[in-house]
Amino acid sequence: MKILFVLISILYAVYCFSSEEDVDSAYLANELEPVEDINSEQYAALEPKEEQERSCADMGQDCKDDCDCCLNIATCNCWFGRYFCSCTFGDYQTCLRKKGKCKRNRPQSCPRSNLNRKKG
């Protein structure tokens, strides 16, 4: 049974390689026509636009202070004092600090966690 399985595997591998070579040689001989994109004319007129710099940084991106981070509860976490700073998750207190300190990217509301509230 094992020998039969090995023989079938070898035959299948040979078949796959030979059919791939046929397609490659037919394409090189221009026997197969390349597929044409129907919408290529639509996108040809559009010029790629340069990405504009965002006013705030997403999580994991470089920052200088808490006001650079996009999320309300995001804080600017720095390694070795002021080096290698990036935006990370903060907490409710971070949001309150940003509300009082930041002029740009100022939080409108600060989300509170439901974990500490008593039920009943």
Curated annotation (Swiss-Prot):
Keywords: Disulfide bond, Knottin, Secreted, Signal, Toxin. It comes from the Eukaryota. The presence of a 'disulfide through disulfide kOR' structurally defines this protein as a knottin. GO terms for cellular component: extracellular region. Residues 56-95 form the Agouti domain. It is found in: Secreted. Coiled coil: none annotated. Residues 17-54 form a propeptide. Disulfide bonds join C56-C70, C63-C76, C69-C87, C78-C85. Contains 6 disulfide bonds. Expressed by the venom gland. This is U13-lycotoxin-Ls1a. The keyword Signal applies. Belongs to the neurotoxin 05 (agouti) family.
